[in-house]
Amino acid sequence: MSSKKSPRTLHNGLPRANTHSWRPPTGSASDPDIVLASLPLGTPDYLRVIGAYFAKYNSQHSKKNKGVSFKTMHDRQRMVVSFFRELRHETPYRNLDPRQLANRHIEAMVARWLERRLSTATIHNYLSFLRTFAGWIGKSGMVREPEFYVGADSPHAHRSEVATEDRSWSAMNVDIAAKIAEIARFDSWVGLQLELEAGFGLRGKEARHLKPHGAVVTCDAANPRDAAAFPECRTFLHISAGSKGGRPRDVPIQTQAQQELLDRVMKLVPPGSYVGRPGFTSLQNQAHFYYVIRKFGISKADLGVVSHGLRHQYANDHFEADAGGPSPVRGGTSRPEGNKPARTRVSRVLGHNRERASTGYLGSDAGLPEAANDPAA
């Protein structure tokens, strides 16, 4: 009788990238160290080599003593497997053992990425994943900065975090209320998640993981820096689960529409539950969310927008209301009088500590003149 494979291990020896807690028992046949010791350098079974390293390290942050999200685990594994598969099938390095990774192999693949016209952000992310993997195989510091591989004068040498175009839904003439209502008629849970993204500038994961009961806090209980940035607000929406880097924040409840949305959400979501389809796991809700929005054209290929564009919408609308003028990506040609405090507030409401983080949504105001005083004032 054949032995059953662990449900956490795929048929090709790769671990499932959807669990933090499980690792084969030390000394067992599936212990990563035992697997690696049994595979000599140059083995054709390169996927088992990769799988052993991912089973051992993938749940760990590359630099900090903490775990990483399921998404990071999945993206890392998918990229590294794809990297070695393409390297072995499409370049002269057909017998490369992942433990023998060197810069000449990375250079060969970067050349292919450039030929395929991958974006700067994608190239930087791929190199970051390889840098992490190199650390796992005992080659910390081997993977260089992008400039080393693409050249100092390449537009891919440095990743710009400054928005150069408005990524809001309105910029692509998408009627936000009508589109969300259309989606909500098909799936009310996905509709609610999109409403929360639009109404509070939440990331998709934050909206799906929100447990609304108990999430509304007074200014006295809110993060002091968030409360100080919005002294006019008496209540805030506490966001923690699903936030980037696990950093909690408190989003000001500034309008009647926001309060009415929260009241409606709390009537629909049972206490202790999150804003997702009941009976679905977190990963199932995530997959279902993207399935539904793509079905209704929310993609770059169809309507030219993604769900994250609602966060850009919120940021730019918030800035314009606070500053009294449009952001650079919306055609602003000068710095409104309230430019700096408005940028600070946008950064805080989006969960960033640095004011310059707002440039990723609003664009840069470097070089823009101060707005002229209104002579009629």
Q: Where are the regions that the model predicts?
A:
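DNA breakage-rejoining catalytic core of tyrosine-based enzymes
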Residues: 156-179, 245-256
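N-terminal core-binding DNA-recognition domain of tyrosine recombinases/integrases
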Residues: 56-162
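Short, basic (Lys/Arg/His-rich) helix/loop patches that form interaction surfaces
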Residues: 290-348, 352, 367, 372-376
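Basic, Lys/Arg- and aromatic-enriched nucleic-acid-binding interface segment
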Residues: 174-204, 340
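The alpha-helix within a helix-turn-helix
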Residues: 197, 208, 347
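Conserved tyrosine-mediated DNA breakage-rejoining catalytic core shared by Y-recombinases
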Residues: 209-261
